[in-house]
Amino acid sequence: AITLEGRWYLQQQEVSKHISTDKPVFAAAGLGLFVGDAKLAVDAVFATTHGYGGEDGNLQGLCMLARLPLCGCDTVSSALGMHKHQASVVFESEHIPTVPTLVLAKEQVQDGPFDQLLVQSQSKLGPDLFVKPENCGSSVGVSTLAKSNLQSFQDAVKLAGLYSERVLVQQLIHPLLEVETAVLQTFDRGLVVAGPGLVVDPAKENVGYLSYAHKYGQVDAAHIRVPSGLEKSIELSILEYARKAFLAIKADGYARIDFFVSGDRIYLNE
């Protein structure tokens, strides 16, 4: 188990609401993981921890330094995947379409001027905006602004700024379908791309943007529908973009790659 402070503890139960702290775990560079003087027998590590420290390259780097066999993406590709703007720059260099975006620096997030930033955002992206942290996941700190005004814009930027130094202001795509793909790397370094699967949200009886609550907090949670029901040409384009994106950020092992579809337009989201 990993505490919010980043401390590791060996657990006796597979699943528990409470963390037992009597057996702290330490990583030794080049040697592995230890509880006291006892080395833990680790066959492989699946870095499935969400958010900061877990999927941003930090945990991956620790595993590599401790010489623990790591499944999935390494430090570089994990960091790129978490930092949305950096990833989009790489994707665009490979002619993969992404959502039109304006990046707000730390100073702008803190001090504005928000009236000028709103005018700039609406001029570039339109009246409806989507605001999110630049390096976060699970829809944390995200706001949708239909017909955005100064107060709602400032509130959204400040909220996203709680989770990231930089904030992304994006064009709010609508109508919108959200689809997901999965990429698996084979032993001979080939790629198998599965999907796309259509995200269905029964709570709202529609298909679209997945909030944090819909992902984790509801009984009738969103689910994936396969086959997606999209036109074959759209599906084939999505699968090809997913393959190119995986290679572009030097991903390894496996990855989930998400897209937005609006009419015949495709956007790689994350």
Question: Language-model features: where?
Answer:
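Short beta-strands and strand-loop turn motifs
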Residues: 70-74, 100-103, 133, 270
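ATP-binding N-terminal substructure of ATP-dependent carboxylate-amine bond-forming enzymes
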Residues: 1-76, 80-86, 104-117
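Active-site nucleotide/adenylate-binding loops and adjacent lid/helix of ATP-dependent enzymes
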Residues: 35, 39, 79-176, 186-188, ...
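Conserved metal-phosphate-binding beta-hairpin within the catalytic cores
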Residues: 246-270
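Phosphate-binding site of ATP-dependent enzymes
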Residues: 150-240, 261, 266-267
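Glycine-rich phosphate/pyrophosphate-binding beta-alpha loops
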Residues: 50-51, 139, 201-205
